[in-house]
Amino acid sequence: MTPERVPSVVFKTRVRDESVPGPNPYRWEDKTTEQIFGGKKVVLFSLPGAFTPTCSSNHLPRYEQLFEEFQALGVDDIICLSVNDAFVMFQWGKQIGADKVKLLPDGNGEFTRKMGMLVEKSNLGFGMRSWRYSMFVNDGKIEKMFIEPEFGDNCPVDPFECSDADTMLAYLKGAEAPGVSEPVKAFVG
């Protein structure tokens, strides 16, 4: 069952801070669900893992590519969430060139678990990960969710049919979804 509101959790993030000495000027910063979603219109999409093929070739790059179109429809932030730590998410964002979509690490999987989207992916050596989904959130209230089919532990496939950027954009425009776009970037890995 989909919750009505985003769950209340604290995310462990890393932020740049020039007052931190040395070659790695970052510090830990806790961010609450209220800080992230409160008073904002947010599109959040969640995926199984940074650096994975579909996530790197289409899911994140297409949201990045369509960012201005989402903004024109009143979306304040687009957030990519994964059950990965802050260091992995940061390096993946650099490698992809993501500078518009915010990458949010759910390192302990708490948000994902409370959303009911945590699945076992030990068949791929991933452990506990997020199922692929997207949602439109208005001031913490979940207005629409697109959850990929075949939800379950150790699913032998990785569906990518409805959590894509084009489907969410079509929903916000009140239009028919055109289907998943072709990959935006080539996956190297």
Curated annotation (Swiss-Prot):
Matches recorded under InterPro entries: PRX5-like, Redoxin, Thioredoxin-like_sf, Thioredoxin_domain
EC number: 1.11.1.27
Lipid metabolism among keywords: no
PROSITE patterns: THIOREDOXIN_2
GO cellular component annotations of the record: cytoplasm
Catalytic residues (UniProt): 55
Source species, domain of life: Bacteria
CDD domains the UniProt entry points to: PRX5_like
Gene Ontology BP terms: cell redox homeostasis; cellular response to oxidative stress; hydrogen peroxide catabolic process
EC class: oxidoreductase
The reaction(s) this protein catalyses: a hydroperoxide + 2 glutathione = an alcohol + glutathione disulfide + H2O
Residues annotated as domain Thioredoxin: 2-177
Similarity comment: Belongs to the peroxiredoxin family. Prx5 subfamily.
Role according to the record: Thiol-specific peroxidase that catalyzes the reduction of hydrogen peroxide and organic hydroperoxides to water and alcohols, respectively. Plays a role in cell protection against oxidative stress by detoxifying peroxides.
Subunit structure: Monomer.
Protein name as it appears in the record: Peroxiredoxin sll1621
Source organism of the structure: Synechocystis sp. (strain ATCC 27184 / PCC 6803 / Kazusa)
